[in-house]
Amino acid sequence: MLNLIYNEWLKIFSRAGTWVMIGILGLTMVGFAFLANHFSAGESNSHWKQELQAQNAELKKEIKEDPSLKDGYKETITLNDYRIEHNIPSDTGYTVWSYVTDSANFTILTGLFTIIIAAGIVANEFNWGTIKLLMIRPLSRFQILMSKYITVLLFGLLLLLILFIGSTLLGLIFFGTGGETAANIHLIYKDGHVIEQNMMGHLATTYLSESVSALMVATMAFMLSAVFRNSSLAVGFSIFLLVAGTTATAFIAAKFDWAKYILFANVDLTQYVDGTPLIKGMTMTFSLVMLAIYFIIFLLLAFGIFMKRDIAN
């Protein structure tokens, strides 16, 4: 199995397109660093306490006029009070962590590139006629397909590491740490309480959570590639869902509770850490179960059909 994975890895990196994708990711990070360095405000705000106190006073005034706003404003007021009490500025200037946080948006690029690899890794074997050469080896079809899927996962992980480590290094070079302890703290509001998190740990979790959507769509692209033997179909359909899936699901969720069973209602796990679930009543456990169900269905279809297919035709 390890030799199969190694061979698949060599195949991927023998193509110029793979290096072009890595180059695009690197240039995007560097370009964004220059833009952020040019437009961002580097100085911290020395009047942050007064501004937070004024904001809280305004929010409490609005709550008094309209009590229905209380639940919506409670988190902001609690976080502001915690910052004031523990001397944790809300604005420490643009630091390495600010840049790494903003760079998390580029996980859509890592997802896109992983989908392209996933969509072609099986279909191209059929298109190029090399699938028959794989079949004459003393290996099971399951081993062959599993090695390809593991290679897709490893490639996606590599891109994620390049993005995370690269953005951290670029952030340190361009923006520094900010020189304040507060810049290394992330606050989370959960169940009426404020929790302090190490910024590095928070960002690592954020990057992994942001990649869940890409993982699921890449797995679907892999399934489509194995089932239909058409990389164009797999790429086009998967990219469309990656870009539009979450937005379309949000529209449906606004009207129907059954939207919680849709894949894209569950891929954003950060909604249970930093925000509010898309649909009331959804939990982290529920989303993980739904993701596991979709994941198993995609792989069962991919392996089930591939293992029964007549390769000669």
UniProtKB/Swiss-Prot annotation:
Top-rank taxon: Bacteria
Membrane topology reported for the UniProt record: Multi-pass membrane protein
InterPro entries from the UniProt entry: ABC2_NosY/YtrC-like (IPR032688)
Subcellular location: Cell membrane
GO cellular component: plasma membrane
Transmembrane segments: 16-36, 106-126, 155-175, 208-228, 233-253, 286-306
Keywords, alphabetical: Cell membrane, Membrane, Transmembrane, Transmembrane helix
Protein name in the entry: Uncharacterized protein YhcI
